[in-house]
Amino acid sequence: FGDLAREDDRYISSRTLNRLTAEIGVKPEATRVALHRLRKEDWLESAKFGRESHYRLTNKGRKLSREAAPRIYGDTFDRPLWMALYDPGSAAPDGLRILSGMCLVAQEQKGAMNVALDHPLPQWMVGRLVDQDVRSAAKNLHQRLQTLAQISDLSNLERVVLRLSIVHEWRRIILRVPDVPDHVLGDGIALRDLRQSVQHLLAVLSDVSLDHVDDI
C-alpha cells in the first residue's frame, strides 16, 4: 500500500491482494490475519463493493508512509558529523550513543572533545549502531539483487510482485539503520552499494502502478 497507494485514496481489492501474496507464497489465511492486524493498528480501512472487500491506507497510514518515503526512495546525503567524547557522568548529548561518554552528533558539543568524522566508523562501532540481523539482511538482499536475471520479459504480475518485494525488504533494512550518510557505516554494512542496486531496479520498475494491478 505504501508503494502503490501512498499518494491517493484508491482501494485495492482483496482479490488483487490475494493474487499478489499468493505469487510470493503467502496463504490467504495469513493475508487475512495481516489485513486484520493492519486495520486494528489503524493503517488500513476497508469497504465492501458488491460482495468483495477492498482496502486502502487510512489518513494515518498515508501520513506515516509519506514520512518514511524519503528514507526508502531517496538518495544518501552528506552532512558533517562529529564524534563527541564527553564526561560519562553528565547528560548525553542529542545524538547516536556508541558507548558511555561517546556519541555521534550533528554539531559540536560544548564541554566535549569533538572529533570531525572524516572516515568510516570501525566495524565494532557500526555493530553498536546496527543490529547483526539488519547487517545480515542487507548483505543477503544485495547478493540476491546482483543475481537477478533480465526482467524485461516479466509479466505485469511478476513486475508488480518484484517491485513490492524489493521495497518491502529494503524498507525493513533502511528504517532500522541510523539516519547518517551511507559512507559513515563503511564496510560494516555496505549500504551505498545496496541502495544503488535498489534504486536501479526500482527505476526499471517505475512504470508499475495500481493500473497494472487492477488489470491482473
Language-model segments: which ranges?
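Positively charged, polyanion-binding regions of nucleic-acid-associated proteins
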Residues: 1-7
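Short acidic, hydrophobic short linear motifs in intrinsically disordered regions
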Residues: 8-20
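Short, hydrophobic-biased segments on the C-terminal half of alpha helices
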Residues: 32-36, 53
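Glycine-centered, phosphate/nucleic-acid-interacting loop/turn motifs that mediate DNA/RNA or nucleotide
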Residues: 42
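Short, Lys/Arg-rich nucleic-acid/phosphate-binding segment
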Residues: 48-54
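Short, amphipathic alpha-helical interaction segments positioned at domain boundaries
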Residues: 62-83
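Mid-protein regulatory/catalytic core that forms ligand/cofactor-binding pockets
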Residues: 88-169
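C-terminal regulatory/effector modules of DNA-binding transcriptional regulators
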Residues: 137-216
